[in-house]
């Protein structure tokens, strides 16, 4: 409440300043503390010298512009979440609207509800900057809390940089027992010698996520919710399945990647050796004060904890040659230890050591970049195999394209294989086949018709959760939530078509993203909407003698009806269901964005049509989507 008052005071003060001062523009910029744009100072370096790079991606630079793409990424994940369906509270899970996969032969990430929030080693940023950089992000939440993301990075010398990042969030939410909280700390460094013969990148990540789990609305509360009775506009009056359950996800990782140049010739040929080390611990737990009929009887106190510890060492050689291109050969040693019901004296698990070898190639020829990778498991049965091929056009014409093929096998996730709970009926040990995916893709970018992409995937041995049975637990007909694992023996055929294009009409623009997808299967094990669309119509202009740049408009989101997976908090995953379809409801947002110097301000009224279209909006069958809500925030960059 104090922040809201402060925000109103600032806005009111600005208005008073405009009314009273004969030079309102100067008074406006001075009133909010801007004297000189640090990057407009001719003595300071260009913004393009503030470099950002990840371990396996191209180098970019800090971008302080205000674009519609920045609006799409101004969220909890700080990623465009077009293909994800948010739950009602910040920090909760997301329901996937498309099928995606990790293009790796390593076992898939267990506990899918935590996957989107999890920061993996390829998500960590490294920096190389001429002056210290600070970035502050603030965004309001649903109720009683806030979301902040802070970054500080500096080069102590031309060759060494370190950065510290902290993301914190706490939000009570509007429904009972749905509080969420996050603490995420990232520390990264990178160093290269003056002659560029040696470089090393390191990072440490600590993530701690807490979610109060209510299991969704009861059947009676769903009826009350959809009735639009004014008594239940206060969502905390709706009954939920659990009032005393909490899940925790903790993760820590130590990572370094070092490379030494052994040979470099005048003709740009070079040979180097490298080593990547990664040690990671992951804990996922579900605690409940009293057992619930939704999961049956329990042998003792509900405190299910699953542990996963991994140590990986990758040794590689890299050859750069004008004739062969970039060639890399690597050897991976992967150690893992998995325990389920880890707090019990009778816990189960497995501990293994597996190895694989990989060969990668990248070469430019005839205005095209050719890249490929082959990885083969040598020892063990949980590492898979991988084959990637990609062709990119690299000419400077108005049309660019890429096409490729991915063929991989991988473990579906350790929790599909082995899981044990204090609930007597929630326990399994399975001998699963490796998931197999064949993916053929094509993408073309054109200034004329935008971006078009096509993916066609064949999926074999798809593992999934479903309910053990449809037994009821009370006179109201409530069905239990006891999960079990199954594996689809036939092939799932998946087609995805995506089109993105922005049309401009002077200072107005219409930004469009449309996804069409089709799934061919004998059983409904992969359930997705056929149509997803996002359309943003907005106006942008410089105002106050170019002291401020604004964007304002409406965003329309929609996905067609489908049998969405239901969130199951005990296993931190989703199970399939065929009883209730969700979707088919429009979501309309109104926004006003502004940029002053290096500060971007965001104001959004979310789901403004919620009271018009009726209470038929859900994130999963028993979890309602977000009501109308006004939120605001900012991103502020400092460069000295």
Where are these regions (language model features)?
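Bacterial Sec-dependent N-terminal signal peptides
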Residues: 1-27, 271, 604, 628, ...
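Sec-dependent signal peptide cleavage junction
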Residues: 16-74
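Coil residues (strongly favoring Ser/Thr
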Residues: 27, 37-38, 58-59, 63-64, ...
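Outer-membrane beta-barrel proteins
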Residues: 53, 57-59, 139, 169-188, ...
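Short strand-turn segments of transmembrane beta-barrel domains in outer membranes
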Residues: 107-109, 120-152, 173-174
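Exposed, low-structure sequence patches enriched in small/polar residues
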Residues: 129-131, 249-291, 300-640
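Transmembrane beta-barrel wall of Gram-negative outer-membrane proteins
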Residues: 146-168, 177-210, 262, 391
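Flexible loop and strand-edge segments within Gram-negative outer membrane beta-barrel domains
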Residues: 198-257, 282-292, 297-306, 354, ...
């Amino acid at each position: 409440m104090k922040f809201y008052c402060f925000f109103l005071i600032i806005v009111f003060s600005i208005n008073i300043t405009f009314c009273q001062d004969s030079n309102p523009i100067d008074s406006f910029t001075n009133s909010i503390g801007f004297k000189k744009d640090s990057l407009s100072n001719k003595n300071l370096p260009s913004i393009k010298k503030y470099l950002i790079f990840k371990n396996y991606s191209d180098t970019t630079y800090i971008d302080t512009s205000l674009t519609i793409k920045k609006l799409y990424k101004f969220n909890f994940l700080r990623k465009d979440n077009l293909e994800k369906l948010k739950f009602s509270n910040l920090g909760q899970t997301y329901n996937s609207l498309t099928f995606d996969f990790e293009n790796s032969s390593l076992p898939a990430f267990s506990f899918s509800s935590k996957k989107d929030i999890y920061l993996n080693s390829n998500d960590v940023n490294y920096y190389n900057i001429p002056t210290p950089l600070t970035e502050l992000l603030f965004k309001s939440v649903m109720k009683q809390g806030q979301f902040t993301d802070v970054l500080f990075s500096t080069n102590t010398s031309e060759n060494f940089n370190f950065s510290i990042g902290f993301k914190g969030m706490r939000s009570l939410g509007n429904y009972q027992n749905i509080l969420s909280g996050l603490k995420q700390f990232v520390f990264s460094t990178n160093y290269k010698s003056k002659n560029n013969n040696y470089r090393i990148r390191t990072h440490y990540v600590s993530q701690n996520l807490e979610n109060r789990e209510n299991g969704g609305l009861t059947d009676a509360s769903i009826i009350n919710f959809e009735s639009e009775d004014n008594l239940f506009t206060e969502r905390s009056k709706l009954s939920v399945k659990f009032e005393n359950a909490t899940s925790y996800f903790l993760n820590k990782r130590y990572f370094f990647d070092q490379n030494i140049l052994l040979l470099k010739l005048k003709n740009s040929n070079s040979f180097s050796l490298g080593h990547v080390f990664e040690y990671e611990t992951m804990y996922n737990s579900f605690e409940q004060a009293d057992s619930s009929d939704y999961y049956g009887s329990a042998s003792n106190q509900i405190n299910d904890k699953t542990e996963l510890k991994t140590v990986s060492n990758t040794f590689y050689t890299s050859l750069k040659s004008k004739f062969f291109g970039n060639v890399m050969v690597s050897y991976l040693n992967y150690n893992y230890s998995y325990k389920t019901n880890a707090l019990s004296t009778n816990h189960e698990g497995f501990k293994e050591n597996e190895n694989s070898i990989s060969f990668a190639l990248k070469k430019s020829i005839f205005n095209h970049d050719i890249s490929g990778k082959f990885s083969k498991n040598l020892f063990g049965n949980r590492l898979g195999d991988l084959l990637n091929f990609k062709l990119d056009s690299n000419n400077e014409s108005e049309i660019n394209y890429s096409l490729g093929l991915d063929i991989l096998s991988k473990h579906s996730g350790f929790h599909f294989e082995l899981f044990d709970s204090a609930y007597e009926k929630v326990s399994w040990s399975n001998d699963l086949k490796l998931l197999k995916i064949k993916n053929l893709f094509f993408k073309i970018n054109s200034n004329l018709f935008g971006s078009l992409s096509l993916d066609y995937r064949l999926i074999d041995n798809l593992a999934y959760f479903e309910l053990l049975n449809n037994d009821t637990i009370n006179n109201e007909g409530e069905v239990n939530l006891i999960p079990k694992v199954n594996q689809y023996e036939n092939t799932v055929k998946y087609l995805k078509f995506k089109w993105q294009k922005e049309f401009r009409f002077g200072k107005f623009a219409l930004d469009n993203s449309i996804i069409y997808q089709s799934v061919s299967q004998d059983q409904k094990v992969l359930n997705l909407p056929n149509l997803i669309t996002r359309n943003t119509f907005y106006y942008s202009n410089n105002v106050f003698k170019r002291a401020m740049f604004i964007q304002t408009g409406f965003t329309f989101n929609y996905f067609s009806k489908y049998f969405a997976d239901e969130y199951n908090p005990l296993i931190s995953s989703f199970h399939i269901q065929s009883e209730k379809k969700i979707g088919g409801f429009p979501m309309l947002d109104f926004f006003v964005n502004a940029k002053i110097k290096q500060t971007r301000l965001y104001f959004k009224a979310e789901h403004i049509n919620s009271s018009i279209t009726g209470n038929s909006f859900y994130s999963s069958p028993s979890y309602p989507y977000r009501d109308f809500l006004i939120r605001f925030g900012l991103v502020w960059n400092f460069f000295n």
